[in-house]
UniProtKB/Swiss-Prot annotation:
It comes from Xenopus tropicalis. This is TNF receptor-associated factor 6. Pathway: Protein modification; protein ubiquitination. A zinc finger (RING-type) spans 72-111. The lineage of its organism: Eukaryota, Metazoa, Chordata, Craniata, Vertebrata. Homotrimer. Homooligomer.
Length: 558
């Protein structure tokens, strides 16, 4: 006899109904059946007694689709902890209990009277539902499994969502490690200057206050670490504005530190007058004033001698005329000494200015020599590339920001040679503005010829093949460089022998690469874009031996 059709009897006269009632009671007492474990009723493996009463049906995708007989009429999902009513309807345990408590003691389907103690577990339906196959709910996973094994699968599924412990965002399990160590804005990094650990998103704020970061002096453009800058401003910077050292005597001039000596020389007399005026004011302020009492000739009592105690006090607190005269004499001697010191300092300043001018001339000569050597070194380095040149464009994000703000971005690389001897070339990169017609937001890349050391030895125009690439800097995966190959066109001015330092005519691609494509791969790494240029000229392909040339045989042994 099927449990699905049993109906408990309240009159005790129907033996079949009584049997069904007994079986229902047995099912209510013991939910184990056919050797199933207590965890069979829940994919999570929890015993039935621990299942929360407010959990609705299984909201998963079945394969094949779920039959309607296994759907809960209340939540319209697969039955969870299926129970059956005396009227033969199935519900999720949590759904029907909530319905009875909220809507009254009746069946939601046919409004038959229904009490909580009349519900009994439908283990047959429960076992059938747990045996149905479902699709993994994780996006990207194509596996299917029985419903009873879903929770176990989710524990090991590489597509299941897991939370990043650093930024609390959810990611597929297979990409979590890459996110934590390469992409997470909260991943830990170390300051390259002071080695302090911080989150990546805090790096910008730290860089603005890092005591060991290099900063540029706003006056002389010298690069120093931040903690040295206050001392540099107050003592060393030759361009920093400072007040005259005689500002306490009244000089209000301000000048750059390297102009202080000239100012002291030009205003020596003025400074001396200021000092003399200050000292005279000080001297007059200490000149003794009359402490004689006011005498009224109409009052004879004023001529009476004062009591001895009053005279003593008066003499104690009043400086004598001799003391004031001595102090004035001392002040005059001090003025004479300071005037002599000013004269000596004036001579010293003149000597220092002469020495400084000599040193400045020498420094300028050294700068010119260093600049020449630097240019020569750059020229030698450009000759060593042998036709393969890699251009490192630093601070590329700032260039992108300028482009977004409609500010033109055009930069040229340093020159390089195709060989030794060889043609001298350079690259030009242009970020097209968002408002540009037909090429908005594109990277334009061109090649220009330059005047080189071997131009008189080379055939013109330049002929050969040029390969331009923007390098993919990804690690651990197959790199996908953005690459274009072009052949030179001798009839164009771009490949003729240049008559100026850099040929204004270039040859290349206006729409070499869209800026959005930079985000698809790691073309920009550490704020740096790498552009590669490989040039193969016809000189590299032609044999140096002239056609028809016959090598001379040896003269033989003597």
């Amino acid at each position: 006899m099927s449990i699905l059709n049993c109906r408990p009897s309240f009159d005790g006269v129907d033996t079949d109904d009584a049997c069904c009632g007994a079986m229902a009671s047995a099912c209510c007492v013991n939910t184990k059946e056919d050797g199933e474990s207590p965890s069979a009723g829940s994919p999570s493996g929890t015993p039935q007694s621990l299942v929360l009463e407010d959990v609705q049906g299984y909201d998963v995708e079945f394969d094949p689709p779920l039959e309607s007989k296994y759907e809960c009429p209340i939540c319209l999902m697969a039955l969870r902890e299926a129970v059956q009513t005396p009227c033969g309807h199935r519900f999720c345990k949590a759904c029907i209990l909530k319905s009875i408590r909220d809507a009254g003691h009746k069946c939601p389907v046919d409004n038959e009277s229904l009490m909580e103690n009349q519900l009994f577990p439908d283990n047959f339906a429960k076992r059938e539902i747990l045996s149905l196959r479902v699709k993994c709910p994780s996006q990207g996973c194509t596996e299917t499994m029985e419903l009873r094994h879903l929770e176990r699968h989710l524990v090991r599924c590489d597509f299941a969502g897991v939370e990043c412990s650093q930024c609390q965002s959810s990611f597929p399990k297979y990409s979590l490690q890459k996110h934590k160590f390469e992409e997470c804005p909260r991943r830990q990094i170390f300051c390259e200057n002071c080695a302090v650990a911080m989150a990546l998103e805090d790096k910008l704020n730290h860089d603005q206050t890092c005591p060991l970061a290099y900063v540029t002096c706003e006056y002389c453009q010298t690069n120093l670490i931040r903690e040295q800058m206050p001392a540099h401003y107050s003592m060393d910077c030759t361009m920093a504005p400072i007040p005259c050292m005689y500002y306490e005597f009244g000089c209000t001039e301000k000048m750059q530190r390297n102009d202080l000596a000239r100012h002291l020389q030009e205003f020596t007399q003025a400074h001396m007058r200021m000092m003399a005026q200050t000292l005279r004011s000080f001297s007059s302020s200490v000149t003794p004033t009359s402490h004689m009492p006011d005498i009224s000739f109409c009052d004879p009592s004023q001529f009476e001698p004062a009591p001895p105690s009053v005279a003593t006090v008066h003499s104690t607190h009043t400086p004598s005329q001799n003391d004031c005269t001595q102090e004035t004499r001392n002040l005059r001697e001090t003025i004479e000494q300071l005037e002599g010191r000013l004269v000596r300092q004036d001579h010293q300043i003149r000597e220092l200015i002469a020495k400084m001018e000599t040193q400045c001339t020498y420094v300028n000569e050294l700068k010119h020599t260093i600049r020449s050597l630097d240019n020569r070194l750059g020229e030698m380095e450009s000759q060593q590339c042998s036709g393969i040149f890699i251009w490192r464009i630093n601070n590329f994000n700032s260039l992108l920001k300028n482009q977004e703000e409609e500010r033109p971005v055009v930069i040229h690389s340093q020159g390089f040679y195709t060989g030794k001897p060889g043609y001298k070339l350079c690259l030009r990169l242009h970020l097209q503005l968002p408002s540009a017609q037909r090429c908005a937001n594109y990277i334009s890349l061109f090649v220009h010829t330059m005047q080189g050391e071997y131009d008189s030895l080379l055939p013109w125009p330049l002929q050969g093949t040029i390969r331009l690439s923007i390098l993919d800097q990804s690690e651990g995966v197959a790199m996908q460089d953005q690459e274009e190959v072009m052949d030179t066109k001798p009839e164009l001015l771009a490949f003729q022998r240049p008559t100026v330092a850099r040929n204004p005519k270039g040859f290349g691609y206006v729409t070499f690469m869209h800026l959005q494509a930079l985000k698809q791969r790691q073309y920009v790494k550490n704020d740096t874009l790498l552009v590669r240029c490989s040039v193969t000229t016809h000189l590299d392909l032609i044999s140096p031996r002239r056609e028809g040339f016959q090598p001379r045989s040896g003269d033989g042994a003597l």
